[in-house]
A protein has these predicted regions:
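Hydrophobic alpha-helical topogenic segments used for membrane insertion/localization
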Residues: 28-57
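Conserved HGGG/HGGXW glycine-rich cap/lid loop of the alpha/beta-hydrolase fold
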Residues: 88-136
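Active-site loop/oxyanion-hole signature of alpha/beta-hydrolase fold enzymes
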Residues: 122-170
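Gly/Ala-rich beta-loop-alpha elbow adjacent to hydrolase catalytic centers
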Residues: 171, 175, 179
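Flexible "cap/lid" loop of the alpha/beta hydrolase fold
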Residues: 184, 192-224
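Conserved alpha/beta-hydrolase catalytic His-Asp/Glu region
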Residues: 204-206, 229-288
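Conserved loop-alpha-helix segment in the C-terminal half of the alpha/beta-hydrolase fold
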Residues: 291-330
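Catalytic active-site module of serine/aspartate enzymes centered on a nucleophile-bearing elbow/loop
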Residues: 320-361
């Protein structure tokens, strides 16, 4: 139900001490880290010009102007000093939870193709969380960490969803990785996990020095301007074309449009520093999946030029009684390129998991 947007006592998120944080974390930009780092300074200089000139296209908007991404009921939950948002539809059976990824323009809209399929063809309760800092949720000036977002997920499942016997989760990228860690710590909350293009099953990440993010955001307005430059419709289209979707499929217009919309919300650039520096990527992401005992399905695209992970660690999961691996000839968003096939494979897996046909590890 709708919660009053009143301030609640703040609970400090779990995290490492500052001394440990200063050592830096491993960033998950894979083998592309060097190429990305090489262009950051030039992009920052160009972006600063955007900030100085200003533009109606980069005008900041309140989150209330962001369109409803899923055509579902949208509610807000007070937590710590903030409020986060989630979508929901009532139904029968075990709740089905969708978790979007973490990136420069992330929101629940990323899960739209699968959500629409389950809306039409299933009677199950459907819920989709929007992480703090993204979508309709508050975008505060805080340090964004895996621990903060895992705590948010735990709070939502415990206090709002309140599942009996756990929920079935469909998570994208880091959304799946956070769910895997929570499934290990709180097996009572998560019955099964479908991980679409999960983070943590590839090669060891290349470290991105923290100095890059500090250099970028020294001048006033550079963080916002750099973000604005990266999230114009034209820039999002080029990135999606070159990095996410296969040429045969192309780039969905709605994917670009909604990404540009959410990027214009006030505070949208605040998680960017933590994302680029690698602080949002769990150090033990691989272990989170290896330690899972619940039914786990991994869905990923096999077109190497259009994915963010190498998935070299999948061999350690394959063959386990609780794991099913589904490779598809797509880019980094298989549920966009082949929504019908992904729906069928996911639906079949969840049905078998419900019947106990997928054995726990």
């Amino acid at each position: 139900m709708m919660r009053d947007r009143e301030k609640q006592p703040r609970r400090k998120a779990r995290g490492k001490d500052e001394a440990s944080a200063e050592e830096g974390k491993k960033g998950i930009l894979g083998s592309r880290a060097g190429k990305a780092a090489a262009g950051l300074t030039a992009a920052a200089v160009a972006a600063y010009g955007v900030y100085l000139l200003g533009s109606a296209r980069t005008r900041r908007r309140p989150v209330t102007e962001l369109p409803n991404a899923l055509n579902l009921r949208l509610d807000y939950v007070p937590w710590q000093d903030f409020h986060y948002a989630y979508y929901s539809r009532k139904g029968r059976g075990r709740p089905l939870v969708f978790l979007h990824s973490i990136n420069a323009v992330a929101s629940a809209h990323e899960m739209r193709p699968l959500v629409r399929r389950f809306q039409r063809e299933s009677e199950r309760p459907i819920l989709a969380l929007e992480w703090l800092g993204f979508g309709h949720s508050d975008r505060p000036e805080v340090e964004y960490t895996p621990e903060l977002l895992e705590d948010q997920l735990e709070h939502w499942l415990t206090e709002v969803v309140q599942p009996r016997g756990g929920v079935d989760v469909i998570g994208l990228s880091l959304g799946a990785t956070y769910a895997a860690e929570l499934a290990r710590r709180r097996p009572d909350l998560i019955h099964s996990l479908v991980a679409v293009e999960p983070v943590g099953l590839g090669e060891d990440p290349t470290e991105i020095p923290r100095i890059w993010s500090r250099l970028l955001f020294t001048l006033p307005g550079v963080q916002r301007a750099f973000y604005d430059r990266l999230t114009t419709p034209e820039a999002l289209y080029r990135f999606s074309r070159d990095e996410l979707f296969t040429p045969e499929f192309g780039v969905p217009e709605e994917y670009v449009q909604y990404g540009a919309e959410t990027a214009r919300v006030e505070g949208a650039s605040r998680p960017l520093d933590d994302f680029l520096s690698g602080r949002l990527f769990p150090e033990e992401a691989r272990e989170a999946f290896l330690r899972m005992r619940q039914p786990l399905q991994v869905v990923y695209g096999t077109v190497a030029e259009r994915r963010m992970e190498s998935f070299t660690s999948l061999s350690e999961l394959e063959g386990r009684p609780n794991v099913e691996v589904v490779p598809l000839p797509t880019g980094a968003l298989p549920h966009w390129e082949r929504p019908g096939e992904v729906y069928e494979r996911v639906g079949d897996f969840l049905e078998r998991a419900e019947k106990g046909a997928v054995a726990p590890a």
